[in-house]
Amino acid sequence: MAKKVFIKTFGCQMNEYDSDKMADVLHAAQGYEPTQNVEEADLILFNTCSVREKAQEKVFSDLGRVKHLKARGVRIGVGGCVASQEGAEIIRRAPYVDVVFGPQTLHRLPELLQQRERLDQPQIDISFPEIEKFDHLPAASVQGASAFVSIMEGCSKYCSYCVVPYTRGEEVSRPLDDVLVEVAGLADQGVKEVTLLGQNVNAYRGRMGSTAQRADLALLLDYVAGIPGVERIRYTTSHPNEFTPRLIEAYARLPKLANHLHLPVQHGSDRILMAMKRGYTAMEYKSTVRKLRAIRPDLALSSDFIVGFPGETQDDFDKLMRLIAEVHFDNSFSFVFSPRPGTPAAGLPDDTPHEVKLRRLQQLQGVIDTHIRSISASRVGTVQRILVEGASRRDAAELMGRTECNRVVNFAGPPHLVGQMVELTITEARAYTLRGQYCAQESPQATMAA
């Protein structure tokens, strides 16, 4: 009987990708099969996120909940950014943990587990071997018509509030050929949509063959768009400073490039942006957005926002709200500032009461929600091309998929549509999703906006 592994993922899409790779590595090396039931697992892994304190502390809370399973010989591992940041401190706080491994060493997980058995003591590997991880990963397993592909690791921007450069290391890009081989392999297995991943994905500079030349993200997108079977391309997460004219032009020449972009601005006050060490002004951000929407007028934008950064005044917050009103974001991920140990911002003086920060966050989220509802309502009556991902979460008898602009659509349709690109007429706008009607016959050209 095959051993089973339970993996709980915290945080970003890069962590989701890494969790899939953990499962692939364990299956290839030791025959583990994934399970969603922690009670039947032989191995429990937490793939962690340290971007915010709440997520970090939840890891230790979850560890406590599975501690009792050690009585029947279950092994427990902690990976991801908390593992990289805390290292041996995890073993000190939770001595029943068997292995601790960083984002760059997940490929060594089978070896670490073997060493745990042989040496009868916890194992820790949070080193940063440059790109070695990708050289030792098995072929990707396909679980649908969409897939993540990591094209680079780490970040070299060192924003004053962010732990990513310390937990995932400096930027390292995968060679161009390696990425293309992985995408082509996924397409051969039926994947129609790929999302290219990186902490700072548009800083990609992949080696081209044996030459000294480097491919940027714009060139990589050209190559990926030419791979047979790939019908839609996404990428995340972008940094405004790396948005080159070539990348902007890609939206004009590549119809396969999805009509959605996650481009975190973080704030709308130049003073706060400078304190964050973001490297751009609000005006420069809006200029990039204008250039993009000159090519794709209905381009859907989403962003991260940090409210209550140390020293944020009411005037600073008002500037943030003005930027939001001007840009009209389609979605957001907004949070109150969470000081992370070891970052410059953690030591900045902060005299803004927490209740004021919470009130500002609620105000921001209320405005964004109004934008989302307005955009959704404008889609009613349009025809949208979606990738059908599977059963609807609302009703298992129905299907769901995503539009070009990453909006979820639920609809009634035959099961054989799963994994296909289909056209739907949008019939209803709900809070954060759409409802559509399947157009079984050939329909008019689908609009790009949704």
Swiss-Prot record:
Location(s), subcellular: Cytoplasm
Catalytic activity: N(6)-dimethylallyladenosine(37) in tRNA + (sulfur carrier)-SH + AH2 + 2 S-adenosyl-L-methionine = 2-methylsulfanyl-N(6)-dimethylallyladenosine(37) in tRNA + (sulfur carrier)-H + 5'-deoxyadenosine + L-methionine + A + S-adenosyl-L-homocysteine + 2 H(+)
Enzyme Commission code: 2.8.4.3
Location of the TRAM domain: 377-440
Keyword 4Fe-4S: yes
GO molecular function, one term: metal ion binding
Domain Radical SAM core: 141-376
Cofactor note as given: Binds 2 [4Fe-4S] clusters. One cluster is coordinated with 3 cysteines and an exchangeable S-adenosyl-L-methionine.
Complex and partners: Monomer.
Family the UniProt entry places it in: Belongs to the methylthiotransferase family. MiaB subfamily.
Task of the protein: Catalyzes the methylthiolation of N6-(dimethylallyl)adenosine (i(6)A), leading to the formation of 2-methylthio-N6-(dimethylallyl)adenosine (ms(2)i(6)A) at position 37 in tRNAs that read codons beginning with uridine.
Descriptive protein name: tRNA-2-methylthio-N(6)-dimethylallyladenosine synthase
Gene name in the database record: miaB
